[in-house]
Structure formats: structure tokens, C-alpha cells
Amino acid sequence: LWFGIVIFLVGLACVTATQTHRILFFVSMMVFILLPRFPLKTAVSFVDVGQGDSIVFQSFGNQKVYVVDTGGKVNFYANDSDKVTKNAEYTLIPFLKGEGIRQIDGLFLTHGDFDHMGDVEEILREFSVETLYVAEGMLHHQNMVNLDPKLFKQTAVVELRQGDRVGVHPTFEVLSPFEKGTGENKDSLVLATVIKEVRFLLMGDLE
């Protein structure tokens, strides 16, 4: 209905308006159409990706976008060749695209379990990811080793440990790991950030 009304108004404007009015009208319509796709303030969204959550941080106008974990689903009843069933295509990916996101400034993987990082390849295929952040030592986890290296050609990979600070609007403080691990639960990347006096503590599956 709304789309039909918009088309009618555009046609009416083309017939009756002067050139200057047409330009102003089209600019106004573009703002009307595109503005709802971009956050007007810092937004934090917890996306249900199945067994776990994916947390999305968006600054004003999507100038900066950070994603913590991708989710992932393991099908224990399938053959080994089809063991991992990707579900990002109907959970996280539609959410990000619906928010007008095309580039992710930082993608954090808290640890190597599939329910936290199993869909990372799908995200790397669908979006431009500037930096992939993992806990120090996690690159040796088998689930990381199995990832397609071709997907990382345009993405920097950075290992983090306690004391590191990354990101802009918001900035994330790394509280753990204290030492190099192997990407297991006990080695989870723990992040803290503050947005408008609200403190967020993201702990992965830290034991």
C-alpha cells in the first residue's frame, strides 16, 4: 500500500512540479525511504541465532559496526560430510542486511565452539569484514584451521589478550584471556564496553 502511494506521489510530482521542486521532492523521498534503514543512535541488538546469541553494535548511521559471535548449528544426525548446517542465512544475515549493513568493522569470535563461530564463513562471504578478532591462541583451534583461507584475503586477523583495547564508538576492553590458549571455553574472549552509561560484559562460554 505504502509503496503504491509513493509511486503515485512521484508520478504526480513529475507532472505538476517545476524542475527545482522535482529535485527537492526526490531528495526528500530518498531520505524518507533510506533513513529508517540506519540507526540514529548507538544500537545494541541480541540476535537469536539458535543455541547461542550474536550481539551487534551499531553506531550512528552505521558508521561503525561490530559483531560478537556468529552462531552456528551442528546437526548430529547428518553424515559427517554434512555435519554443519549453516543457519546464518535465515538469522544473522537477514538481520544485518535489514539494518542496511554492508560492512563490518570488527567481527569478534569468543572461542572455537560451533555455536559461537560456526557461521563465520557465511558472514565473510556476504559482508566486507575489516578485522576478525579472536582470543590469543584460538587460530590453532581445529574449527579455525578448517576455515577457507581464501575468505580472509581482505580481512585482517588479530589475536587479543587481557589489556588490549579495540574499536571506536564503542571501544571494547579485553578482560580475558590472560595467556595464550587453544580456543576452548576456558580461553574465551571476554569483552567489556560502555554505551550511554550502560556497561556490557560479554563472556563467551568462560568457565
For the regions a language model picked out, list residue spans one by one.
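Non-globular, low-confidence helical/coil segments that flank catalytic cores
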Residues: 1-207
